[in-house]
């Protein structure tokens, strides 16, 4: 997350963002697991506060703010599959109300060994061991491809030299009917 945020601001020629907004489905799971394990192991006694600080969901956003010495708006959304969309919507609202000129917005998540095992056993992940890369996403098997990573974008209310894209809009959709969801995606494309 830190490197991704540095790359985004460097490419946008932004020295210090006015706001930092991060979306994460689950936060820093490995650090949370470590903290809770130590809490149990030491019977809630003799714990360093650092372990707790690193286990909170806003750890990445706060580390980025410290790095940039940014004392402005800083928020983290933990809305599972809608986290990045929520962060992006917040960024666009800040820009629209002219509360910020440049907003660093990103999404980040990690997969832990325990988390992967649980999700895999529940059938959420595809078995990718026998699939070739070129057919991986066209395969009609059940589940998703497990992944983790970070992506950050420097978003501005005005076009700047080197701009890569324009955000035409954000729409968060929720469907219970698969056919309705497919039709809506076709309309957007």
Task: Please identify what each model-predicted range represents.
Residues 11-19, 23, 38-49, 71-73, ...:
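Structural signature of cysteine-dependent C-C bond-forming condensing enzymes
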Residues 2-7, 11, 65, 76-106, ...:
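Active-site-proximal alpha-helical scaffold in enzymes
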Residues 101, 107-112, 117-120:
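Glycine-rich anion/phosphate-binding loop at the beta-strand->alpha-helix junction
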Residues 1-63, 67-68, 109-111, 189:
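Conserved beta-ketoacyl condensing-enzyme motif
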Residues 47-52, 74-82, 141-142:
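Flexible, glycine/proline-enriched loop segments at strand-loop-helix junctions
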Residues 120-189:
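Condensing-enzyme catalytic core mediating Claisen C-C bond formation in acyl metabolism
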Residues 24-27, 80-83, 108-112, 171-175:
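Acidic, glycine-rich active-site loops and adjacent beta-strand->loop/helix elements
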Residues 34-39, 115-127:
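Short, surface-exposed, charged loop/turn segments at secondary-structure junctions
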């Amino acid at each position: 997350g830190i490197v991704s945020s540095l790359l985004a601001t460097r490419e946008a020629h932004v020295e210090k963002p006015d706001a930092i907004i991060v979306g994460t489905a689950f936060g820093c799971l490995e650090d949370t697991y470590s903290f809770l394990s130590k809490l149990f192991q030491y019977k809630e006694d003799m714990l360093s506060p650092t372990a707790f600080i690193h286990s909170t969901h806003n750890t990445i956003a706060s580390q980025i703010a410290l790095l940039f010495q940014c004392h402005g708006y800083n928020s983290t959304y933990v809305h599972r599959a809608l986290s990045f969309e929520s962060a992006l919507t917040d960024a666009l609202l800040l820009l629209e109300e002219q509360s910020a000129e440049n907003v660093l917005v990103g999404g980040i998540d990690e997969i832990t060994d325990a988390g992967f095992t649980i999700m895999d056993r529940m059938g959420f992940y595809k078995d990718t061991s026998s699939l070739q890369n070129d057919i991986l996403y066209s395969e009609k098997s059940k589940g998703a491809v497990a992944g983790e990573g970070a992506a950050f974008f420097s978003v501005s209310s005005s076009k700047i030299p080197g701009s890569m894209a324009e955000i035409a809009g954000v729409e968060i959709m929720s469907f219970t009917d698969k056919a309705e969801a497919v039709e809506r995606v076709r309309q957007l494309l």
